[in-house]
Amino acid sequence: MLEAMALNPVTNDTFTAEVLEADAPVLVDFTASWCPPCRAMDPILAAMAEDRDDLKIVSVDVDSQQELAVRYGVLGMPTFMLFNAGTPIANLVGARPRKRLESELREALMQQPAGR
């Protein structure tokens, strides 16, 4: 089983290149090693990362990357933020089944103007 921290971890130094300047939508998993619901999401996110080539999935360890957590107002975990064209378009807090997460992501992406 893959751990979230192994799921393309990003830092304050790499966030712009990996998330804000990405060519595809990016799901950012704000997570912590001590968070049981975060750990429950690890296999779901790992499977999604393996199955989907239209979505980049990265993780941010809120303990070591507090500046990013503060910048994006992360208060509960796990928090999933979907970025498209460098802009956060969805903010989802809490563990959820894969079907629900994918449905919420699809809905957020469909709400985007054409050309993004």
Language-model segments: residues:
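Short pre-active-site segment immediately N-terminal to redox-active cysteine/selenocysteine motifs
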Residues: 23-24, 30-34, 76
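N-proximal helix/coil linker or "cap" segments that precede and/or mark the start of modular domains
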Residues: 1-6, 116
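Conserved redox-active cysteine motifs that mediate thiol-disulfide chemistry
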Residues: 30-44
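Conserved helix-turn-beta segment immediately C-terminal to the redox Cys motif
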Residues: 24-25, 40-60
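A short beta-strand-turn-helix
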Residues: 8-26, 66
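Non-catalytic, surface beta->alpha helical segment in thiol-disulfide oxidoreductase systems
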Residues: 82-116
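Conserved Rossmann-like nucleotide-binding pocket used by diverse enzymes
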Residues: 6, 31, 56-58
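Structural micro-motif
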Residues: 66, 72-81
